[in-house]
């Protein structure tokens, strides 16, 4: 699902109240971390990821890694925090994506 500007704005507003659920540390980006991230997005659809100061990767590298390996979309980047969105594979969990489609 490609997001339009209004849809991203809606998701950014929703993400502003969330706390980061995942962190990227000195271990960097691994396939296991990405699998856990993907599983969490299947349940929540919208989460935040914090890039710790001791991480060896930049925000752009994390964004490129996530978007290149999966169908997760980066909705917003503020400093070292990314807001991520993915439509849930489980139809019962698609509350947020149903609202986004109506916009």
What kind of region is each of these model predictions?
Residues 1-103:
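Positively charged, polar, low-complexity stretches
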